[in-house]
């Protein structure tokens, strides 16, 4: 009864960079990201046999409620005009084709206005019964790991063939922190990929020490003010001086878990609405065996 949540942008970026850009449709349209995404999805279904699946997409990759409190949030990824997200020119035309194809396959796609895909996945993870497997290359989602409800992250940093299945023990081994405190750790450490600086002067070791001794930001700040022996004076001083950033860090780092999700059937599609449309897209864009592999994985 496994639910599989696909971090779609993470997958199509990984597919784009992992497949040769010489893969082209008959009309010259690049299709490497499309083919890679389909291939990964087929393999993931074969590995984990989910009975529910959602392709989660960005409603807004820089939600206003995060940017309003921290204008630099993900600003490092903005295009030169300061509007959209910078992405490879050869990837951009592939995304609408891929989304059309997923729609024809009957794979549910969910994106909610003013929320990131991370927030959508987090809400599904807390609202839907487990087991849940969250497929991503993004470590931000480690905060969703929940051993009691069997929520794990299929982490693709090393590729699908060598992926890690992240549970609390994995987090504890990797970062030397309690497995349920990754978000707290990230608040202090920061995340350059999202333009988040963390608390000035506190790196991974300092953040790990804090996460090992305190359950949340308020506790850590109180410990710093009290000059608790678990904190060296220099570290306590940095926590105190980082008070302004720490006021907003939870909103920036914690995934929203109360997104208003649309009512839809997230069961694995048992048959296509019109298989001929899938084959038409396959032929038009020269998608070859990638489409066939997903059809096989779905047991149509």
Protein language model regions, located:
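Non-catalytic nucleic-acid-binding/docking modules located in mid-to-C-terminal regions
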Residues: 49-54, 86, 107, 148, ...
């Amino acid at each position: 009864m496994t639910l599989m949540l696909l971090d779609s942008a993470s997958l199509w970026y990984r597919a784009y960079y992992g497949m040769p850009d010489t893969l082209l449709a008959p009309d010259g349209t690049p299709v490497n990201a499309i083919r890679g995404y389909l291939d990964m999805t087929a393999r993931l279904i074969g590995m984990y046999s989910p009975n529910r699946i959602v392709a989660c997409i960005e409603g807004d990759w820089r939600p206003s409620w995060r940017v309003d409190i921290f204008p630099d949030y993900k600003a490092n990824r903005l295009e030169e005009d300061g509007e959209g997200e910078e992405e490879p020119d050869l990837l951009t035309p592939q995304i609408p084709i891929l989304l059309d194809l997923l729609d024809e396959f009957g794979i549910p796609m969910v994106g909610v206005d003013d929320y990131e895909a991370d927030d959508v996945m987090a809400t599904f993870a807390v609202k839907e019964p487990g087991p849940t497997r969250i497929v991503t290359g993004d470590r931000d989602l480690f905060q969703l790991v929940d051993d009691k409800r069997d929520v794990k992250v299929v982490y693709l940093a090393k590729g699908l063939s060598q992926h890690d299945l992240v549970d609390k023990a994995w987090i504890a081994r990797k970062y030397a922190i309690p497995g349920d405190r990754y978000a707290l750790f990230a608040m202090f450490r920061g995340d350059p990929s999202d333009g988040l600086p963390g608390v000035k002067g506190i790196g991974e070791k300092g953040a790990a020490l804090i996460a090992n001794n305190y359950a949340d930001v308020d506790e850590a700040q109180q410990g710093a003010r009290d000059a608790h022996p678990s904190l060296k004076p220099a570290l306590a001083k940095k926590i105190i001086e980082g008070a302004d950033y720490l006021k907003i860090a939870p909103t920036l780092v914690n995934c929203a878990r109360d997104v208003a999700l649309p009512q839809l059937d997230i069961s694995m599609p048992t048959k296509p609405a019109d298989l001929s449309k899938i084959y038409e897209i396959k032929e038009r864009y020269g998608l070859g065996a990638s489409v066939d592999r997903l059809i096989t994985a779905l047991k149509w």
